[in-house]
Amino acid sequence: MIKNQVEMFAYAKINLALAITGRRPDGYHELESVMQSIGIYDRIRVTLAEGGIQCSCGEWSGPENLAYRAAEAFLSGLGSSQGIHIDIEKNIPVQAGLGGGSADAAAALQALNKLFKEPYTEEELKSFAAQLGADVAFCLKGGTQWATGVGEELKGLPHAPKINLVLIKPDQGVNTAEAYRAFDQEGKFSHLDYAGWQEALASGRAESLIPLLYNDLEPASMKLLPEIAWVKEELMKQNGCLGALMSGSGSAVFGIVQTEEQAEKIAAIWRERNYHVWVTHTMERGNIYG
């Protein structure tokens, strides 16, 4: 019997650090980032079917969804007209800086490659990923990675220790393009300390990462949505929170917390304030098959 459906768990990411290092002639920004998989995931089911590509993801259904575009690119490369149905159970919030759309696209590529008996190598899948978006290549690989270029060039780092996290997201999101435009007005290019990150991660202690947390987009996104600054400031005051940072272009802020019990207590405070809150942790790998 031919397997006609593959299920994937598509994991979100946070940026433990993000520096904008320059801007290319085509307008894209070059960066250095320490990217990290976390335990919040979307559930993706990809099924061989009839009638072209269909992508079901609530209000994010249809051809604009990155998973749909991933399927288009995959099939086009094979010269195939096979019908594909993609069903996405969405748990990763959008416009949060957590790479939800990218995780879904990466999972769609991985699921399709399995369904079609692996016609593409890992390098070829990475090539598709680079065409789809800056974070898709990371989501194919997952874990803890040093990203450069526009985010598509990856180099492994020591696995982060298991870190307890609280994620808090305001109702309003931040548009990534708007965040970069705001950065262009006032931001300055910078670089991260690769050797410092290697050493901190290799120590196996969450506390070692705190001095290195950094995000060049944070001031820009805080200007667009000042609530982010308030969330970060309040989170830092709470018992057990070692450090906090906005992820990516926001609007989600993560707090690194000493224990899971403390993370749950902090989360309860923010739920009472009617915020979107998740208690999670770092992951050693990214997307996995269901």
UniProtKB/Swiss-Prot annotation:
Active site: 13, 135
Gene3D superfamilies reported for this sequence: 3.30.230.10, GHMP kinase, C-terminal domain
Keyword presence, Nucleotide-binding: yes
An individual GO BP term: terpenoid biosynthetic process
Record carries keyword Kinase: yes
Pfam family, one: GHMP_kinases_N
Catalytic activity: 4-CDP-2-C-methyl-D-erythritol + ATP = 4-CDP-2-C-methyl-D-erythritol 2-phosphate + ADP + H(+)
Pathway: Isoprenoid biosynthesis; isopentenyl diphosphate biosynthesis via DXP pathway; isopentenyl diphosphate from 1-deoxy-D-xylulose 5-phosphate: step 3/6
InterPro entries recorded: GHMP_kinase_C_dom (IPR013750), GHMP_kinase_C_sf (IPR036554), GHMP_kinase_N_dom (IPR006204), IspE (IPR004424), Ribosomal_Su5_D2-typ_SF (IPR020568), Ribsml_uS5_D2-typ_fold_subgr (IPR014721)
The organism's place on the tree of life at top rank: Bacteria
Annotated GO MF terms: 4-(cytidine 5'-diphospho)-2-C-methyl-D-erythritol kinase activity; ATP binding
Entry keyword set: ATP-binding, Isoprene biosynthesis, Kinase, Nucleotide-binding, Transferase
Enzyme Commission number: 2.7.1.148
Residue positions binding ATP: 93-103
Record family assignment: Belongs to the GHMP kinase family. IspE subfamily.
PANTHER family, per database record: 4-DIPHOSPHOCYTIDYL-2-C-METHYL-D-ERYTHRITOL KINASE, CHLOROPLASTIC (PTHR43527:SF2)
NCBIfam families noted in UniProt: ispE (TIGR00154), PRK14608.1 (NF011202)
Function of the molecule: Catalyzes the phosphorylation of the position 2 hydroxy group of 4-diphosphocytidyl-2C-methyl-D-erythritol.
Name of the featured protein: 4-diphosphocytidyl-2-C-methyl-D-erythritol kinase
Organism annotation: Desulfitobacterium hafniense (strain DSM 10664 / DCB-2)
Classification lineage: Bacteria, Bacillati, Bacillota, Clostridia, Eubacteriales
Gene that encodes it: ispE
